[in-house]
Amino acid sequence: MASERPTGSESGDAGVVLEGNREASQDIKMALYKHGRLIPSLGDAKFGRPMIAEILEKKFESYRNDQTLNIRGTLFFGVSSSLSGVMANLVFRYSFKVKYEALRTYASLTTLPFVATAVTYKLFVTDALQSGNISQESCVLRSSLIGVACGVSYPSALAFYKNGRLAVKYHTVPVPPKGRVMLHWLLLCQTGMKAMAVPLLFQIIFGVFNGLYHYAVCEKAYARIVPDD
């Protein structure tokens, strides 16, 4: 009977082991907490996989929506430039009294301003916003300048050139006198130049609103990607 009773050294060792187990379990509990958050175990991780997949799916869905909005805004901007090209072609054909090759001139005045606006806007606004190296004021300024350059100046110059060549080819306007060629053409198209003030104002306003809208969309996208600490 005496041999079955634990000796003093054995009971002391058992107490040390129990105390060590308590400390180890306490260390494990402390290790499971990091920055006030409980680290999930393997079992919790299995249950958390569907939640992570759902979060990633929502992230990708919001990214696709943002990309759709960006593309849609660029397309609308290009369409407005195409409409300005159609108006410029109509005005200068009337000024030069040209009635030939209407389909060819309207096709070029519709397509080229659209492509120029879309490409220029992507290079100077969209790419800059995605890199984060542009402010709101700079975004609005670039957008409005693109509207003026690609939506008014370029279509007007293109319509002047194409319809001026047709006017000379088909002799629909008097031949300019020597030494006054530029003045002659300016007098012929002064009415058309005044009429282009309407799309000029529209492109400036549309460029400002499009720049503000595009910047706000990118800011929301960055806020979702980079959460607050």
From Swiss-Prot:
InterPro entries: TMEM126
Places the protein is found: Mitochondrion membrane
Keywords: Chaperone, Membrane, Mitochondrion, Transmembrane, Transmembrane helix
Pfam families assigned: TMEM126 (PF07114)
Membrane topology: Multi-pass membrane protein
Primary localization: mitochondrion
GO biological process, one term: mitochondrion organization
Transmembrane segments: 71-91, 109-129, 140-160, 198-218
GO cellular component entries: mitochondrial membrane; mitochondrion
Phenotype upon gene inactivation: Reduction in respiration by about two-thirds, only when the electrons were fed into complex I via the NADH-linked substrates malate and glutamate in ADP-stimulated mitochondria.
Subunit structure as annotated in this protein's UniProt entry: Part of the mitochondrial complex I assembly/MCIA complex that comprises at least the core subunits TMEM126B, NDUFAF1, ECSIT and ACAD9 and complement subunits such as COA1 and TMEM186. Associates with the intermediate 370 kDa subcomplex of incompletely assembled complex I. Interacts with TMEM70.
Function text: As part of the MCIA complex, involved in the assembly of the mitochondrial complex I. Participates in constructing the membrane arm of complex I.
The protein, known as: Complex I assembly factor TMEM126B, mitochondrial
Native species: Rattus norvegicus (Rat)
